[in-house]
Amino acid sequence: MAKVSVLNVAVLENPSPFHSPFRFEISFECSEALADDLEWKIIYVGSAESEEFDQILDSVLVGPVPAGRHMFVFQADAPNPSLIPETDAVGVTVVLITCTYHGQEFIRVGYYVNNEYLNPELRENPPMKPDFSQLQRNILASNPRVTRFHINWDNNMDRLEAIETQDPSLGCGLPLNCTPIKGLGLPGCIPGLLPENSMDCI
């Protein structure tokens, strides 16, 4: 049984300009005191084509953690535009929040992110080289995808199997303007960015 349960993730200041920091308010509960730190990360998926474009925006150690409910605001700088392929700068991608204990990842919360120009002229005729100063970032806060992993909480043994679950308590916000694939609830423009068997929150 997991010793840590994530109760809620609230996306703050959304939508916002591309260069604005990411801010998430994370609430979690420990069923018993943890002797060591939890490591939280925010990861920006720069391209669906390769993990080499993933950017770890920030990581923070929280602990030792006493039993009970806890809440903190996790802020990370925007991704480095120079590390994002120009063809992937505008459109839909993913931001991930992960947490590990003893180096074992036990939860991953993924959000679709839509980067688009607000200026109608730029939207109609986008520049060849993306102008990140004109992009707005909109996180699909209402539809997080939550993946939980069985881990060994007492030592550093290998992580056990992963399970995909839905958690209706996580997230609320504005939807993206992206056409879903019928029956899947997945934006048609980005199949495969998140696991096919992960579940939408209702």
Curated annotation (Swiss-Prot):
Superkingdom in the source lineage: Eukaryota
Stretches assigned to coiled coil: none
Chain positions with Phosphoserine modification: 198
Assigned keywords, A-Z: Chaperone, Chromatin regulator, Cytoplasm, Developmental protein, Differentiation, Nucleus, Phosphoprotein, Spermatogenesis, Transcription, Transcription regulation
Record flagged with keyword Transcription: yes
The keyword Cytoplasm belongs to this UniProt entry's keyword annotation: yes
Location (main, coarse): nucleus
Sequence segments annotated as region (Interaction with histone H3): 1-156
InterPro entries, per database record: ASF1-like (IPR006818), ASF1-like_sf (IPR036747)
Compartments, as annotated in UniProt: Nucleus; Cytoplasm, Cytosol
SUPFAM superfamilies: ASF1-like
PTM section of the record: Phosphorylated by TLK1 and TLK2.
Organs and tissues of expression: Highly expressed in testis and at lower levels in colon, small intestine and thymus.
Signal sequence extent: none
Positions of the UniProt region annotated as Interaction with CHAF1B: 1-155
Family: Belongs to the ASF1 family.
Assembly: Interacts with histone H3 (via C-terminus), including histone H3.1, H3.2 and H3.3, and histone H4; the interaction with H3 is direct. Interacts with the CHAF1A, CHAF1B and RBBP4 subunits of the CAF-1 complex. Interacts with HAT1, NASP and TAF1. Found in a soluble complex with NASP and histones H3 and H4; the interaction with NASP is probably indirect and mediated by H3-H4. Interacts with CDAN1. Found in a cytosolic complex with IPO4 and histones H3 and H4. Interacts with CREBBP.
Alphabetical list of PANTHER family matching this protein: ANTI-SILENCING PROTEIN 1, HISTONE CHAPERONE ASF1B
Name of the protein in its database record: Histone chaperone ASF1B
Record organism: Homo sapiens (Human)
Gene name as annotated: ASF1B
